[in-house]
A protein has these predicted regions:
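A conserved short coil-to-beta-strand element within the FAD-binding core of flavoproteins
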Residues: 174-187
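Beta1/beta-strand and adjacent pyrophosphate-binding region of the FAD-binding site
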Residues: 2-17, 35-37
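Conserved N-terminal/central alpha/beta ligand/cofactor-binding core
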Residues: 42-46, 50-168
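General beta-strand structural signal in soluble alpha/beta enzymes
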Residues: 36-38, 82, 143, 172-175
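Short beta-strand "acidic-cap" motif of Rossmann-like dinucleotide-binding folds
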Residues: 31-38, 43
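A general beta-strand register signal
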Residues: 73-74, 173, 192
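Aromatic pocket-lining residues of Rossmann-like dinucleotide-binding sites
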Residues: 24-25
Length: 192
């Protein structure tokens, strides 16, 4: 990493949270000087020997869990499109705001090439029958539409997102581990 110290925003980690943080910042305030620091590699350099050898060789850093897009880069890529699953965001922001943000995130994935098909909402008759059986068994069925990215398409989507951030002026320092966050007068002022 060079010695430049005049960044407006420093984002630690290039997983989905870091990616979407940078995306929103450049959309809302394109003049910001943004640095993203990631301990792993760029997406195009994330290669795991285990794919061919079938044995983990203990790479440091691990290309499966670190690098641009984080652990999700090589996952099956299923996006849950309901606030009813996945955590307590609705409790924090309210149900409607959580749903709005899920749709906003989904729109970004669509913009960068996600398949438009959504699974789980087209078989209402079958869903009603499963719901009836669940109630009879004292269970609650939670409907959750799913957008399936797929491993290969997810990789392409994240590659396009990486290119978008770079071409929009976000500086990404790969293979860089943050050791500490500098605090001055109670505010984050930099990183080591």
């Amino acid at each position: 990493m060079n010695n430049r110290t005049d960044f407006d925003v420093i984002i630690i980690g290039a997983g989905p949270s870091g990616i979407f943080c940078a995306y929103e910042l450049i959309k809302e305030r394109p003049s910001l000087n943004i640095l993203m620091v990631e301990k792993g590699r760029p997406i195009e350099k994330r290669v795991c020997p285990k794919r061919t050898t079938k044995v983990c060789v203990g790479c440091r850093p691990c290309s499966i869990t670190t690098g641009f897009a984080g652990a999700g880069a090589f996952s099956d890529g299923k996006l849950s499109l309901s606030p009813d699953v996945g955590g307590n965001l609705p409790d924090i922001l309210g149900y409607d705001k959580a749903l709005e943000l899920i749709h906003e995130s989904d729109d970004i994935y669509l913009k960068f090439g996600a398949d438009t098909k959504v699974y789980g909402g087209d078989k209402q008759k079958e869903i009603q029958e499963i719901r009836r059986r669940a109630i009879m068994a004292n269970l609650k069925l939670i409907e959750c539409p799913i957008r399936h990215l797929g491993t290969e398409e997810g990789y392409k989507i994240y590659t396009r997102l990486q290119e978008h951030l770079l071409s929009s002026g976000v500086r990404i320092e790969f293979n860089t581990m943050v050791q500490d966050i500098l605090i001055e007068d109670g505010c984050a002022s930099g990183i080591l």
